[in-house]
Amino acid sequence: MKKILLSIFLCLPFLLSAQPYTIKHLSIREGLSNNHVVSIAQDKRGSLWFATEEGLNKFDGIRFLTYYKEETTGKQSITGNELNCLLDDPVDSILWIGTQRAGINAYNYANDSFITYRHNENNPESLVTDDITKIIAASDGNLWICTYW
């Protein structure tokens, strides 16, 4: 009997202090560019980034900001709207974005700028292909890039 009462008293604080989880469903109704999300990352500022089949989406907890490929304005942007993967750089304020057939984009969210890395058949140091499937941070500060090649 003592063991039963002791077990109840030991478990009771855990049961009483439990907080209910709140789950917020995010979709195109809330501003997401597409319901087909292929990758999610959280940056150092707490924003959530969603890679979709129709652009890059930043969610600040209240609203979405969508980044699309800009072909007509000349504005700096991502190189493609069909995305495969995201990685928040463990050191710098950079979000690495792997695309389908459009290389890698490095988005610096500290100064709102993009750098693009593409395959160049004349440069053996470039990406082997523009189809990027996964980006992984190595412990030595380098990146592992997975491709369809």
Question: Language-model segments: which ranges?
Answer:
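Carboxylate-rich, polar loop motifs that coordinate divalent cations or form catalytic acidic clusters
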Residues: 1-149
